[in-house]
């Protein structure tokens, strides 16, 4: 075991604070990574405050990890000390089920999440990236390009793959009209990725003041979704919609925008269920309502390579670890464009 430091929540009502804990020793197939940057995902906040009712304290959040390899186990073939490396939402899975065989580890019933998940190696809970180091099986470690700003790459490990995977699954590309609902951490990545894939991108937002920024990010059109007059011309015009909004809202407003055989995919996990959608709205145009969860390791690497090729990163605000509690409060107010990233060097000076 190796002693490390991090930031943890010890209850739903306490702020995160300095935490000393241990990582497992480096095994034959493991990679030890010095964490340079860790993105701040809204899932971190949900878990810390036990809004999904599954937190096991203490919680060390963080699943958007970019770092540098410190050491590798004897059987590791794809990495060496000094390499850049990334870790996303998963650190293990069963490796034998149909989902794992199809490189869809995120759907494995026995997958292990990067934090707040039972660790098969230690018997304890996993601890995430708000830390100076992490040890992960090589299969779940990703290659990071040195062509991109590392801090801005970190959110790709969650926000990037969470939006890339459904866009790829539903074959978004040239000639398609694609709607993106919401312009937050997920939405701004969805706009960039859909545009890079060649689609005509329509951004739907409740905030008129986001129009200029949405077009800067790559949206061809911006529609204020609470304005009925703006929404009417878009009825039955979209091939695919990626809905990134987690807050419960009326889904029928958006399914009505789909063409026959169109699909709307939900990305955001709501604290409360959405109102039930109109079945008729789906049946009479053979529309589909679907969901998608992050992405498998192979696809995550594909996404990282795609982003390096197209010079795509997240828009980030870099913060010291000491400001994480204030960052959570700002997230709740929507006061971030578009993702906080922790500079983990500040943990050493904390």
Model features per residue range: what roles?
Residues 187-188:
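N-terminal Rossmann-fold NAD(P) dinucleotide-binding loop
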Residues 174-183, 193-253:
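Adenosine-nucleotide cofactor-binding segment
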Residues 24-38, 51-101, 106, 145-148:
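Glycine-rich beta-strand-centered segment in the early N-terminal region that forms part
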Residues 94-181:
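NAD(P)H dinucleotide-binding glycine-rich loop of Rossmann-like/cofactor-binding domains
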Residues 269-285, 297-303:
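Rossmann-fold NAD(P)-binding glycine/threonine-rich loop
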Residues 262-263:
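Glycine-centered, small-residue-biased loops immediately flanking beta-strands
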Residues 2-4, 297-350:
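C-terminal hydrophobic helical "lid"/dimerization subdomain
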Residues 258-259:
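Helix-to-beta-strand junctions that scaffold the AdoMet/dcAdoMet cofactor pocket
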């Amino acid at each position: 075991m190796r002693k490390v430091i991090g930031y943890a929540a010890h209850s739903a009502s306490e702020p995160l604070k300095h935490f000393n804990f241990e990582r497992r020793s480096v095994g034959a197939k493991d990679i030890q990574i010095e964490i340079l940057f860790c993105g701040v995902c809204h899932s971190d906040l949900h878990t810390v405050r036990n809004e999904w009712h599954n937190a096991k304290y203490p919680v060390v959040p963080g699943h958007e990890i970019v770092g540098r390899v410190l050491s590798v186990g004897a059987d590791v073939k794809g990495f060496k000390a000094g390499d850049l490396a990334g870790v996303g939402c998963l650190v293990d899975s069963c490796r034998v089920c149909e989902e794992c065989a199809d490189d869809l580890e995120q759907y494995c019933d026995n997958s292990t999440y990067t934090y707040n998940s039972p660790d098969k190696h230690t018997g304890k809970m996993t601890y995430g990236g708000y830390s100076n180091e992490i040890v992960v099986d090589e299969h779940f470690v990703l290659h990071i390009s040195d062509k991109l700003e590392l801090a801005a790459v970190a959110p790709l490990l969650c926000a990037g793959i969470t939006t890339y995977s459904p866009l790829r699954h539903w074959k978004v590309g040239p000639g398609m009209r694609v709607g993106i609902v919401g312009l937050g951490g997920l939405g701004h990545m969805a706009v960039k990725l859909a545009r890079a894939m060649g689609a005509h991108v329509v951004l739907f937002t409740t905030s008129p003041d986001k129009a200029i920024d949405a077009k800067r990010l790559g949206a061809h059109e911006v529609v204020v979704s609470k304005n009925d007059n703006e929404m009417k011309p878009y009825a039955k015009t979209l091939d695919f919609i990626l809905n990134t909004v987690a807050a419960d809202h009326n889904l029928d407003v958006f399914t009505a925008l789909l063409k026959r055989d169109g699909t709307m995919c939900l990305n955001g996990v709501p604290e409360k269920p959405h109102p039930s959608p109109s079945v008729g709205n789906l049946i009479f145009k053979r529309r589909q309502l679907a969901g998608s969860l992050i992405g498998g390791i192979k696809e995550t690497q594909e996404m990282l390579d795609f982003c390096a090729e197209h010079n795509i990163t997240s828009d980030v605000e870099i913060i010291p670890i000491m400001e994480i509690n204030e960052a959570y409060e700002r997230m709740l107010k929507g006061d971030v464009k578009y993702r906080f990233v922790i500079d983990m060097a500040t943990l050493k000076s904390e």
